[in-house]
């Protein structure tokens, strides 16, 4: 067993507040996070915050994520249950970048040596997809209505 980590960086033209609010709204994940998240919501709590547990996924595979840090609009951390790894913790850090936001999404987990490399690649690819999708979904629409 060993500890392994990854880091994903994405940029958004949305403000840190807009990105944070999107990520903090568990029921909305199903609207923007892609095909792996068909269902999303809170198990405990109603608006998030430290101690709240969100359930994300698609039948029959779900994860439960317990919010461990909630510092709007700059930082959110959570621990994850329901995956074949131990001690999985993620942190999303948001920083102003010009007129937008830099999203730094990192994860750490413990896994057997033989599984660590493929699990790290899978988790990194999944989180990269979430970061890219969140960056786009948080951006206000520029389409004008007629």
Model-derived features with residue positions:
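A conserved amphipathic terminal alpha-helix motif
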Residues: 108-146
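Hydrophobic-ligand binding "helix-grip"
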Residues: 31, 55-102, 108-110, 140
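Residue-level preference for beta-strand/loop junctions
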Residues: 2-4, 48, 59, 86
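Anionic, Ser/Thr-rich low-complexity intrinsically disordered regions
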Residues: 35-42, 46, 77-80, 103
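Hydrophobic ligand-binding cavity/cleft-lining segments
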Residues: 1-43, 146
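Catalytic cores of transferase enzymes with a strong primary signal for eukaryotic protein kinases
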Residues: 39-40, 45, 54-56, 109, ...
